[in-house]
Amino acid sequence: VIKSGEKLSYKLGTRGSPLSLAQTNWVLDELKKTNSSLKFDIEKITTKGDTDTRPLFEMEQKGIFEKEIDRAVSEKRVDFAVHSMKDVPSTLDSSLTIACVPKRESANDVLITNEGFSLDSIPSGSTVGSSSLRRAVQISRKRPDLNVKPIRGNIETRINKVIEKKIDGIVLAKAGISRLGVDTKHSILSKDEFLPSPGQGALAIICRNDDSKTIEMLKKIEDKNS
């Protein structure tokens, strides 16, 4: 039943990477389960993190994957945005709010190799790629005999470097391969031994804090446990 004055058409902003689009489409599918009349228009927005090819730890990381998208929300060019929670800064623009955190994926990191090695069993001298300083430090601390190399690119690009044997392994978030439906040999890294990034595996849906209709619509897929 459509309520009088109910808003049914929304525009949202997201990065154009395969993972960002997969996350966004998952959110839209969940929202449509709450109301099949909802219609969404996706606007792909390029961020600084998409165009700067330096290793992430050489960049000023605050807002590199979300600032341009949040600006579009704030300026009312889009109604809401879907982010990885770990990319959201601790302080948002005063006009914005995290309207919803839907069901969270695993927070663990994984090691991907062609052989399915664990971090304990991967041979000494192997080269392991990581886009994150946090992961690089933890790999080196646990296995100082490995060569840790900065690696950029979307998840498929990084995995292909392993398949093509340009690198022996990569460490990335399990949530990424789960959301993309990527079937690849991997070893799950224990959170006790390999601390994930705060908010890893969770999504944050951002909208304007005075947009009560959008907030009400988004709250329907809030997962309190996440």
Cite the ranges covered by each PLM segment.
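Small-molecule-sensing regulatory modules
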Residues: I2-T47, T51-R54, E58-E60, R141-S226
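Glycine/Thr-rich phosphate-binding loops of Rossmann-like dinucleotide-binding domains
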Residues: T91, Q138, L180
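Short, well-ordered beta-strand segments
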Residues: K11-G13, A81, A99, G129, ...
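Short, structured active-site "lid" loops
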Residues: P55-F80
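Ordered, amphipathic secondary-structure segments that act as subunit-interaction surfaces
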Residues: K76, H83-V88, A202-D211
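Paired acidic/hydrophobic, glycine-rich loop segments that form the ligand-binding mouth/hinge
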Residues: G63, D79-S84, D168-A173
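A conserved helix-loop-strand patch within extracytoplasmic ligand-binding domains
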Residues: M85-K86, S94-L146
